[in-house]
Amino acid sequence: MDSRGRPKSYGGDFIRTKLFSKSPVQASTAGRVTDYGNGTYVARFFLSFPGRLHVAVKLVHSSEAVQVLKRLQEGSLARRVMVCGFQEETDPNPEWMQCSNTPNKSLNLRDVCDFSNPLINVSFYCQRPESSRCVSFVGCHRDHAATLAMHDKMATEEEKKLFTRDRDLHEELPRDISVQVKGKRRVWKVHGKALPLCGPRLPETASEGYWFNGAWTSLRCQARRFRTVESVVECLHNKTVFFRGDSTTRQWFRYLMILLKLQQHGRGAQPVFGIDEKNKIKFHFLFHKFPRNQGPVMDGNDMGYVAEEIDGISGGKDVVIIITLWAHFMAEPIQTFRSRLYGIRHAIERLHSRHPDTKVIWRTPNTGHHHQFQHYVENSDWYAYQLLHIVKEILGDLNISIINVWEMSESMWHDDDMHPPNDVIENHIDLLLSHICPL
């Protein structure tokens, strides 16, 4: 139905579907939706477990809302305001100027501080301060008030109504559709054939996998369980693991640090690391550089552009690089993300030309929780889903592992959360270690 209750004759809605059972086991899997463009949608599920299964459908965004999001994403400006400080040693206070990953075309080039690095496909510009030099750059933060004012002008009042909680089906409906599935649950096999070992360039499948009593079963590769400290240590023995990206990468870093009871060196937004001297395991996390969506001032020296970081890493068979780039890019023009990915792609190719046995692992986006217009404008799941496909398009043919956690997130038993709870992260780590240490 459209906004007036009439049957739709066009597609474009952003829909999620799930097949699940609650008894005697708790199991679930995400469906894949085909949009026929005429108001008709078909959800397909890979039947992986037997029982009385129920179907749930969730309208995340109507097609009208998607058009608004698409218009904003394809624009030339970010959907947040970032200001950066410039301060000479003799000045008591910094000058705060607007900065962005895209140039402000209304400014003369003489009025711009250009911090771009074309060698790694990075662009970053600031309005030149009146009394400070460009080299006096001290840090940046999100201007929340200016960002909200910008959001208010980005859509009409009618368009904003498309994102109210009573417009979309935030509850999964209907709950009275069920099917009886018979047969036996198979592990590591699909249609009688063994799944490949976890690693790069895995073939596409009808489903990423399914939840079964709290454990994720992959249908893409032979993922194992690493539920003891001993099994994790055995996998990571003598390895140096670099975590590069956003807070969802840091969540993996922290999980492993706590699991192995390692002391964290460094704090806050600074680079942090942990070392297990006995087992020769090293973890190192560094947040990616701009764009960043953060209120407190961020020191640029505490961050690094991922491509630049890759160029500075000495690879080898005992080196693992884990990358996640999405949460802070959803509010950027789509070309900013594409450009950044190409820079990272070239850096990975340079790394593998030096050390072809270096493992590179990319973690995809997952779903998040939104309930205000500003959240949708900056961080809608529709944006995250587009970034997922761009990652596969630009990086999919490289010798890297892409761990797709989207369907894990869609079908989990928890509410949507950019930072899923620990029992979900535990299953993420199983996948990660299965790619580092395949059978």
Question: Language-model segments: which ranges?
Answer:
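A compositional signature for long Ser/Thr(±Pro)-rich, low-complexity
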Residues: 1-439
